[in-house]
């Protein structure tokens, strides 16, 4: 068996990489992009389903219209222009995939490119609104033993 090894075949196998095909809850990406809002509602989780049932109001629809316009105006094989929004409670729908959104964190707009893995999540999940705590040394009065730490 060892003498049947062919270097050309091994190189060809290495070139032919297989990527994991994306699916959201058992629905392929191509089929996901073709879903209507009613069909999408049946696929997403309960919290998103409830939000979709209540209807997309003026502001979320306005964001989707801006994203459509940005995608339409973009040149082929290029990212669309940034669309800024304060709508952190907007659920990512398949139509938004490939768009670039500036999500407001309360201080600044964080630029995020929407990927297929983000479908069903809220926009706010991708723009952190607080600065994570970096724990340093305890201050004076933090514990009883800190009374014996000499002052600098």
Curated annotation (Swiss-Prot):
Domain of life (superkingdom): Eukaryota
InterPro entries linked to this entry: Ribosomal_uS19, Ribosomal_uS19_CS, Ribosomal_uS19_euk/arc, Ribosomal_uS19_SF
Record-linked Gene3D superfamilies: 30s Ribosomal Protein S19, Chain A
GO molecular function: RNA binding; structural constituent of ribosome
Keywords linked to the UniProt accession: Ribonucleoprotein, Ribosomal protein
Pfam hit, one: Ribosomal_S19
Gene Ontology, cellular component aspect: cytosolic small ribosomal subunit
Homology family: Belongs to the universal ribosomal protein uS19 family.
Protein name as it appears in the record: Small ribosomal subunit protein uS19
Originating organism: Podospora anserina
Gene encoding the protein: RPS15
């Amino acid at each position: 068996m060892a003498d049947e090894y062919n270097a050309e075949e091994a190189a060809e196998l290495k070139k032919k990489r297989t990527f994991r095909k994306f699916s959201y809850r058992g629905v392929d990406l191509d089929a996901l992009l073709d879903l209507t809002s009613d069909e999408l509602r049946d696929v997403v989780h309960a919290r998103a389903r409830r939000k979709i049932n209540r209807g997309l109001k003026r502001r979320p629809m306005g964001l989707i219209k801006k994203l459509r316009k940005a995608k339409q105006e973009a040149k082929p094989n290029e990212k669309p222009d940034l669309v800024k929004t304060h709508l952190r409670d907007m659920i990512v729908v398949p139509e938004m995939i490939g768009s670039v959104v500036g999500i407001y964190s309360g201080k600044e707009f964080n630029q995020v490119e929407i990927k297929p893995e983000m479908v069903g999540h809220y926009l706010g999940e991708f723009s952190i609104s607080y600065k994570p705590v970096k724990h340093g040394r305890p201050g004076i009065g933090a514990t009883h033993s800190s009374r014996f730490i000499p002052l600098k």
